[in-house]
Amino acid sequence: IDNLHKAGVKDIVVVGGYKADVLKKHLERYNGITFVENSRYAETNNMYSLYLALKHTEGSGFLLMNADVYFDANIIAGLLEKDKEGNSLIACDRSGYLEESMKIATDENGKIKHISKQIAEDEYYAVSIDVYKLNADAAGILSREIYDTIEVKKSENLWTEVALDAIFSKTVFAPYEICGRWFEIDNHDDLRRAEQIFKGDVI
């Protein structure tokens, strides 16, 4: 949130599940935060959390990110600056293949054609850092895909990237190669490593 504020983003929706009351209390220190609770967090996934938040996007484009990734503020600033061209973007890191992370593959024109954890090393272009910028067109297409997945197909325990992967043939996404530090925090060991990487910052 601090990084978003530094980049000039003020209208923020946070979706929480586990210990939602603690998170909501923590967010009271900020202005302009809309909190949405996913009370079914134990049986759903992040696509369902986004589904709950979509009514707050009002048909506009938006930034989408996972809260377990910590990164430099300049990554968001760069993404928004690049967005002046009107593209939908996926922030990505080309420094190395990470087995457990989402990867992207691109077509011959450099546009993203696939996102998945299962993309092989000889086919991937970069690792996604789970930060996405959607223009209004892409946001609308993604919203319809998510509504269809959850309300019609009744598939509630899927990653958002499953829906993203399904819309690349309908709208254009380009990779945004980051310049800055980032780290995904899944456990206490990861948190300790992140504290070393971002030493001097508040995590």
Cite the ranges covered by each PLM segment:
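Conserved core of the sugar-phosphate nucleotidyltransferase
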Residues: 72-151
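Conserved beta-strand segments of alpha/beta enzyme cores
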Residues: 32-34, 111, 172-174
